[in-house]
Amino acid sequence: MEPSESSTRELTLEEAVSFAILLQQNEQLAEAHEVFRRVLETAPDHPRALHYAGVLAHQQGRNSEALALIERSLALVPDQADWYSNLGIVLQADDRLDRAIDAYRRAIAIDPSHANAHSNLGVLLRATGKPVEAEAAYRAAIRLKPEHIDAYTNLGILLNGLKRTEEAAACYCKVITLRPKHREARKLLALAHCTLGEVDKAVDIFEEWLEEEPGDPIARHMLAACTGRDVPERASNGFVETTFDSFAASFESKLARLSYRAPALVAAMLEDSGLEHSHRLEVLDAGCGTGLCGALVAPFARRLVGVDLSQGMLAHAKEKNVYHALIKAELTDYLRDNSEGFDLIVSTDTLVYFGDLKGVIAALAGALRPNGLLVFTLEQAAGGSAGVDYRLELHGRYSHSQAYVERLLTFSGLQSKIVQAQLRTEAGAAVPGLVIRAAKSVSVQQAEV
């Protein structure tokens, strides 16, 4: 049987672009990239091919290329609301918030019913300190698309930060109605109940969650945070991996909305130490996350190593191009297994996932070379917490008393300087923290705790 003409003919350009988009939607990104490449070789100014090749470049982490391609497509066809919305997403990922806001506004001007553009605009208005406008944008998205889960979730987070906790809880309830097993909304609703003094309702949410998913690390950890019962000595590996893998892509933009200052505070503490930008030191970024500290400590480093438990976070750290090695490992295990040692160790917002710090601080001290320096941040327990070494807070991180930290550093043979500072905001309130610098002398003798 001879093949028919229709089964052997070449695709038209439009068919090829549509096929590439289908591959893209099915997450066959390499195959889609090849089809777009061949189309653009034939027709370099094909608007749809340019645009969706740009979207693909963004999906593959090539934001500069994505931006150039999408802007070329819009120069050719400037009346596409979806395309401006996609431009906003790329600009937002690149932390160009003002331009992203403009892109979302252009999308809305072209198509006022574009719910996603309204929702994403709300995120950026909140990030740039415009809560009233952000609320209006979220509500516009919900009015246009009543099942818009992201808009309801983000509106709830905004309202919670404005101390409108009951309204926030109503938003989370709506999300759960739309998607009953939405993990973030379940967690946020339970925490809202805790804030309102309705601990029993929070417990019910987490216990129902654990009945459905026994051993779920998020539910188990947050149940302990709400009740103060069965508090673990540190967050489990599962909790850390699940939490940070789930929002690695949006991690930096979320921290920007929280006025996150930990990396800058660590950099200031290093400057205060008199350490020179010599590129001579072996440096460890302990709990490197997406690499926010990497560029700040790179000038000190002959070799810079980043360690983190989240593969998603490490993937973003790699894009910073400042690390000589990135290693997926639990921090204490890595430190104990490492035999080379470091001249400088920095750690921001990592030890807040440890309650009992004795083991990890001993491991950090053991990994320091003589005259080595350790700089890290912790959240400070409220009111000094006399007699309390650490506490698991409602947000799921641990806070520590300064006296406890000083005692452990002395026990580990480290000479310390501790500065109190605001690390970030959370739910509209400042989060008090400790910025610690600890030095290891040539001769170290441990004392009794």
Model-derived segments and spans:
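A short glycine-rich, Lys/Arg-flanked "PGG" loop and its adjoining helix->strand segment in the class I
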Residues: 358-370
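Short, glycine-/aromatic-enriched active-site segment of Class I SAM-dependent methyltransferases
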Residues: 376-397
